Each structure stands twice: as C-alpha cells, then as structure tokens.
C-alpha cells in the first residue's frame, strides 16, 4: 500500500543569499570538461553555474560554482550557513543575539531540516520546539480569505521572559483524517493508496490578548496548516527574467487549458494586475534611487513576494525570530487595532499583544530587569519608567519599547550579507540515474500525460541584474552571486493554480512548487 499525505501549504520560509566579493569576480565561468558533455542537458538541474554533484544526505546544502570560485564569497557562505543552522538566543550581546520578545521559531533549520521541506506535525498539539517540524499555522477569516488581525501572519507561539506568547500552541490541536477520492483510493491495476488531510482547531483561550480582555471576540476564523518547502536554488529562480515570467502567464492565459484560469488578482488580459514593491519607510534605504520599482510576484505558495532580496527568506530572518537589523528596526506585531484611533493606535501601535503585555501585572513585574539588559545606558529614555511602582508609567514604557521603530540593531549588516550570500548561493543537486531506462521512461511519461504543462521542466535565466526592493543591495550587486544565461530545470511554471484539496490552501490558489 502506498501512502500519500495532502498537506495544506501556503507560505514559506524560503531563504535568500547574499555575499561580498570584488566587482570583477561575481561571475564564474566553468572550464570545459569532456565528462560534462556526456550527460544530457537535464542532468544539470541548476545549469553549469548552479548544479552540485554530491549525492549524500548533504546534497541540498552545497554552494554554487560562483561561491566556490570566490574566496570571500566562500567564507561568507560558511558564515551564512551558521546563521541559518544555529539557534538564536534571548541574550542581548554576543553571536545570534536578540531572539524575541515574541517569536515563531528560534532558528531557520527548525522548519527546513537538510535545507528541504519539513516533516509534518503528528496528531495532537501543535508544537514547534523540535527541529524538523515544517508546519506553520494559517489563521484566517474565511469570509475574506485574509489573515486574522489578532495574530501575526506567521503566528508567534513563543516569547522571552517576562513576556508571554501571543498564542498558546498547546491549545491548537491537529487531527489527521482519512479521505476517499472519486476513484475509491485505487489505481486501475487494483493497487490502493491512502489520502490524509489535517483538521486543525484553535481554542479561543489559546489567544493571550483575548485572555487578558483586550479582545472581546475573535470573530469568524479558520485554521490551516502550511508546509515549508526547500530553499536550495532560489537564486536561480530569481535569475529568470521578468519578461520570460510574463510570457509564461500570457501563454497559459491564451491556452485556456485550466478550468479555473489564472488568478486574476495577479494577471489578466495579458497584463499584470499587480506586482511587488516595498515602499515602507521603515524598510527602504532613504538614499535608494530605484525605490518603488515593481517586479512580478514569484516566491511563496501564495505569491506574496517578488525579488529574492526581499522575499520570504530575507524577511523570515527577521520575522521568525524577531531579530532586528538595519532595515528592520521594529518588532513583528499583530495589527488588531490598525484601524483604531486613540491610545490603541498611538500608544499600543495598533497591536493587541502590545496592549495585553503592557498591562499584564506579571509582565510589568519583570520588565525593569529585562529592559535594563536591553538598554543598560538608557539611550532610549521612553523605554524606562521613572517610577516602577506606577503601573501606568510601566505600561507606557513597555508599549514604547515594543512599538519602537528605532530598536537597536541585533543582526549587523555583515551578518545579513553573509546570510544572503549563503541563501542566494545554494546549488541544486544534479539529476540522478539519468542513464537508467526506467528514469528515462518516467521522464517521457511525465511529459506525455501533461504534467510538464504546470511543472515546466526548464527555463533559461536572463542577465540576472537582480533588484533589492529595500535598497540594501544595488542592482546586480557584486557582493552576491549571479547566474546569467543558465538553462535550469526547476519543473515549475511559477504560476498559481487551484488544487481543490480538502481543507484547501488559503485563497485556493497555490504556486507550482519548484
């Protein structure tokens, strides 16, 4: 019997990679190798510059050739790898500092073991402390398909003392249910298979702000699971030109093969309906001359991100851990009071968790010792109370700290560059057993039965003068590896389609996973 699991997927921690190198060494052209010419083109899944040839369990962790050919990039890649693999700590000095005050996971590898997708959360309470659980919660309003405002988009189930987690994960329960399809879960030859899907319940008292009386009602909400995906080769996907991506959308729209067509929120009548840009003054370099450029959405299941330099991985390094950096000097918070007026907006920054934390007697009792470690020299006077017996003063100080947009930098620029060099520098393992008749036959069948339409086998990258919406990196920045004019084999059209799963993905639209 074969077992298949239907995972409800959506976001992604997809990570990004950047590096520092000299201006004339950011491209690498491999020398001709007679042995290379004996393999079919599809053997080189990442092209000549982005393919790795290791076949062990570490195959997804290898650097691309531009990384290996550049000593400085190679060292940055190794440093970035450590930032991905090691846990962040709640101390306020030293390496990998600054975890919290509320956070989703303490490391990237918690969700991406072996740099691939995570394993599923077993039945029972949702838990994120073990490395390997690649499930994230999607808590949304089914009336609007939008995320609920009383939690962050990626719900935070942990907090550093004296703060309390916005969500009590022990009160989020997962049940895996059996599903029978229209064919009775049997292949034509009689072989059977299992289909399963998760049913997730979240008790109202799992939400800290509601327990503290800040939220009176959670309203209509539903909970899904989303699975992380692999992060290798994302630099190669970023190197596909915007024009080629648009041509793929236009072709599929014109073909009209899909019963549900294309997601018209992104593309309609041959043109983009919307594209990605980042115009937040908190994020974008004020001296960035190319700010506000628009580029197609191409990353995450939900197509929530555009260029890799501001995509899921670069963002996750901040919002999963709540570790600040020079272009993210604020905390990742819920937006429950975003449309409110008065103190809910001006004092508590629109966040229900901030309001609950600021007025929680237990949080207030531990706040003085906490903030004196964070800001021992009192460089931020509003974060401190003059009289810690005055509950109103303490509440204001807590709120000022949690909502500040001038937090001290916890990940310095050099570490962030290292992380991005690593992320953009991850190679794709070469195809295996390319001479095996069964593999060759399988590839032919894959194309014959139509899988290759959505799972487009290959693309050719453009010039790869990549763009960073934050303005941290310049266009085609020499500190990062580039992959121009490479034939790559991601087996994805990078377009969203409807999968019609039980307890379907939020919005029902899911990008074809590379």
Locations of the language-model features?
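Sec-dependent bacterial lipoprotein signal peptides
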Residues: 1-19
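Bacterial Sec-dependent N-terminal signal peptides
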Residues: 17-45
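N-terminal regions that are enriched for targeting/export leaders
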Residues: 35-63, 77
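Extracytoplasmic redox metalloprotein regions
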Residues: 55, 62-76, 85-415
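Surface-exposed patches in mature extracellular/periplasmic domains of secreted proteins
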Residues: 89-99, 122, 430-437, 441, ...
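The canonical Cys-X-X-Cys-His
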Residues: 103-115, 231, 419, 442, ...
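His/Asp/Glu-rich metal/cofactor-coordinating catalytic motifs and the adjacent surface-exposed loops
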Residues: 128-142, 146-149, 153, 434-512
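His/Cys-centered metal/cofactor-coordination and adjacent catalytic loops
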Residues: 418-432
């Amino acid at each position: 019997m074969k077992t298949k699991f239907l995972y409800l997927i959506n976001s992604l921690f997809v990570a990004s990679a950047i590096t520092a190198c000299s201006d004339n060494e950011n491209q690498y052209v491999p020398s001709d190798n007679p042995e290379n010419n004996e393999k079919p083109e599809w053997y080189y899944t990442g092209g000549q510059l982005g393919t790795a040839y290791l076949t062990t369990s570490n195959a997804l962790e290898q650097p691309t050739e531009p990384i290996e050919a550049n000593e400085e990039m190679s060292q940055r890649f190794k440093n970035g790898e450590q930032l991905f693999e090691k846990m962040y700590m709640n101390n306020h000095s030293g390496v990998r500092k600054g975890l919290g005050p509320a956070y989703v996971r303490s490391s990237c590898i918690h969700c991406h073991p072996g740099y691939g997708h995570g394993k599923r959360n077993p039945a029972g309470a949702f838990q994120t402390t073990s490395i390997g659980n690649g499930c994230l919660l999607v808590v949304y309003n089914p009336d609007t398909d939008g995320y609920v405002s009383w939690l962050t988009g990626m719900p935070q189930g942990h907090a550093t003392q004296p703060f309390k987690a916005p969500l009590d994960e022990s009160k989020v329960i997962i049940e895996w249910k059996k599903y029978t399809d229209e064919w009775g879960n049997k292949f034509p030859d009689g072989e059977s298979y299992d289909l399963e899907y998760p049913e997730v319940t979240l008790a109202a008292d799992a939400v800290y702000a509601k327990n503290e009386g800040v939220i009176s009602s959670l309203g209509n909400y539903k909970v899904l699971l989303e699975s992380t995906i692999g992060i290798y080769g994302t630099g190669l996907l970023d190197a596909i030109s915007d024009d080629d991506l648009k041509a793929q959308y236009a072709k599929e729209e014109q073909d009209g093969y899909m019963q549900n067509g294309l997601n018209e929120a992104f593309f309609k009548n041959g043109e983009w309906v919307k594209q990605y840009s980042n115009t937040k003054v908190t994020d974008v370099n004020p001296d960035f001359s190319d700010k506000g450029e628009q580029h197609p959405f191409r990353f995450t299941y939900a197509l929530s991100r555009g260029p890799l330099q501001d995509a899921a991985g670069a963002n996750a390094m901040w919002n999963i851990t709540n570790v600040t950096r020079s272009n993210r000097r604020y905390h990742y918070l819920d937006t429950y009071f975003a449309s409110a007026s008065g103190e809910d907006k001006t004092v508590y920054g629109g966040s229900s968790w901030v309001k609950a934390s600021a007025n929680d007697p237990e949080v207030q009792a531990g706040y003085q010792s906490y903030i004196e470690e964070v800001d021992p020299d009192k460089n931020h006077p509003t974060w401190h109370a003059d009289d810690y017996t005055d509950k109103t003063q303490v509440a204001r100080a807590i709120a000022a700290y949690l909502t500040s947009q001038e937090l001290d930098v916890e990940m310095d620029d050099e570490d962030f560059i290292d992380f991005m060099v690593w992320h953009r520098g991850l190679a794709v393992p070469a195809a295996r057993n390319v001479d095996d008749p069964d593999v060759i036959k399988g590839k032919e069948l894959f194309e014959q039965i139509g899988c290759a339409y959505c799972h487009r086998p290959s693309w050719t990258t453009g010039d790869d003068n990549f763009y960073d919406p934050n303005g941290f990196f310049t266009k085609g920045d020499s500190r990062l590896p580039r992959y121009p004019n490479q034939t790559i084999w991601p087996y994805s059209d990078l377009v969203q389609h409807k999968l019609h799963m039980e307890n379907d993905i939020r919005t029902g639209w899911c990008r074809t996973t590379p």
